[in-house]
Amino acid sequence: MARYRHSRSRSRSRYRRRRRRRSRYRSRRRRYRGRRRRRSRRGRRRRGYSRRRYSRRRRRY
């Protein structure tokens, strides 16, 4: 029984880790895509503001 419980916890931790990594990658990809589009459209005017906002969001994630 002890062995079964150990394997179960191990699989659960592995699943959780994989899920977290995938979600983080997806969020990062979307953020980079949005930033690139905004920079090309607006230019250098709003660069500092966008950077500050993104840093705050990154900290939360």
UniProtKB/Swiss-Prot annotation:
Main localization category: nucleus
PROSITE patterns, A to Z: PROTAMINE_P1 (PS00048)
Keywords tagged on the record: Chromosome, Developmental protein, Differentiation, DNA condensation, DNA-binding, Nucleosome core, Nucleus, Spermatogenesis
Region of interest: Disordered: 1-61
Annotated Gene Ontology cellular component terms: nucleosome; nucleus
Tissue-specificity statement: Testis.
InterPro entries: Protamine_P1
GO terms, biological process: chromosome condensation; sperm DNA condensation
UniProt subcellular location: Nucleus; Chromosome
Highest rank taxon of the organism: Eukaryota
GO molecular function: DNA binding
Keyword Cytoplasm (UniProt): no
This protein's record includes keyword Nucleotidyltransferase: no
Recorded family membership: Belongs to the protamine P1 family.
Protein's job: Protamines substitute for histones in the chromatin of sperm during the haploid phase of spermatogenesis. They compact sperm DNA into a highly condensed, stable and inactive complex.
Protein name: Sperm protamine P1
Organism whose genome encodes this protein: Macropus giganteus
